Structures are given as structure tokens and as C-alpha cells.
Amino acid sequence: MPEEVKAHITGVVFQVLAKPGDKVGAGDPIIVLESMKMEIPLEAPRAGTVIAVKAKEGETVQEGDTVALLE
């Protein structure tokens, strides 16, 4: 079952660093959010393959939103 990567803070997607098919390690940044004038990386909770990125640059995401899926 895929694992969700969720936003832990409300913010604007500043940069998408991974795309479907990319292999990532635990702690690798997948998306960078901008919130309160700070850049906050959303990291992979474990090693795996990105199967979907659900957020686009410039989009606002809310705390708890799923921004990517890992397999």
C-alpha cells in the first residue's frame, strides 16, 4: 500500500523536487513549502519510489494535505 507524504504546515508549494518514478531515501526532500517567509522541506518518511506528486508549484496546501505518494 502506498505511503502518503503529508504537509505538516499550511503553505505555498515553492518547489517540487521529485517526480513519479524517482527513487528517494528516507529524509530526502520531495517538496519545499514556503510558509511564514521560511522554506520548509517535506521529506520522504522512508526509502522508496515516488508514484505520484499531488501538489504543483504555486499551489497552496493545507496542513494534513497529501502532497505525494511513495511505494
Spans of features found by a protein language model:
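Surface-exposed, flexible loop/turn segments at secondary-structure boundaries
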Residues: 21, 38, 58
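Short hydrophobic beta/alpha edge segments that flank linear recognition/processing sites
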Residues: 25-40, 62-71
